[in-house]
Amino acid sequence: MLIITQTALELGFLYALVAMALFLSYRILDIADLTTDGCFVLGAAVSVTATAAGHPVLAIFAAMLAGTCAGFVTAFLQTKLGVPSILAGIVTNTGLYTVNLMAMGWKSNQSLLGGKTVFTMLRETGIGGEWYELLLAAFVTLLAGLLLVLFLGTRMGLSIRATGDNPDMVRATSLNPSFTITVGLCLANMLTALSGAIVGQYQKTVDINSGTGIVVIGLACLIIGETLLGRRSVKKGVIAAILGSIVYRFIYAIVFYTKIVPVECLKLLTAIIVALAIAAPSIQKWATFQKRKMAARNKEGV
């Protein structure tokens, strides 16, 4: 049971970076960025390939740079070519499939058999004992979360937040919304690629299809966290992303351990939860309308 708890915490922290990326793109910028799936694999592919070449630390930064480039392409399609945000994400995601294959040497998967990773480097120092993987995962995620909160409190960060709320107001202050959108999407995809990079070294493998459904899982984590903490501020939003990811991984671990629901059906269950959570305001309005309608009929009947 201790191993299950440890693994759930490790994966919860690692995938929380994706939830934070979606918090930035979906909640702050109000953009449905579908680049996430391909960008996650891009980060993992670059990281594993560079690590196999003997550069595990450099691999992390290379993956982040690759993710930033993917975000820039998506933003360029939206802001300069007028492609709708959803289509821009789909187009970039489709192109990333070939880029990811190229990064893996035109193979559908790649592994690190006995190779040195950032995790093994930490283990060799003796820091963290048996919990060294959890220690590194928590450190990277919490540091990224802190930096994101601090960044969104700067002038540029406030401009990005304002762009999601009211682009016209941003234009009135002589700022270019296209620039703030580009910065926001680059940062979001950098976080996604960072998650893929760390996960790739954690699992010591990457597969071309390993990013399938990541955007839905990330949204589920974000929604779970917001349900528990709310979304009144940026700080709470980032904490909610981390907490939601950990809770989701514990749910996954419980389902896997108890077999209450077949593990093969978990992504379907996740998709249903996300759909219901996103549709909740509309469902609530419909329910309120029906109650008023019934109350009006009852009054007429009396």
Regions found by a protein language model. Give the residues of each.
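Single transmembrane alpha-helix segments in multi-pass membrane proteins
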Residues: 3-55, 76-81, 223-230, 272
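Loop-to-transmembrane alpha-helix initiation sites
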Residues: 11, 86, 133-137, 181, ...
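Short loop segments and helix-boundary regions at transmembrane helix junctions
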Residues: 27-32, 72-117, 122-123, 155, ...
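Helix-loop-helix "hairpin" substructures at the membrane interface of multi-pass membrane proteins
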Residues: 70, 130-215
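Transmembrane helix-bundle core of multi-pass membrane transporters
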Residues: 85, 96-153, 183, 265, ...
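Cytosolic-side transmembrane-helix boundaries in multi-pass membrane proteins
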Residues: 165-172, 176-179, 251-302
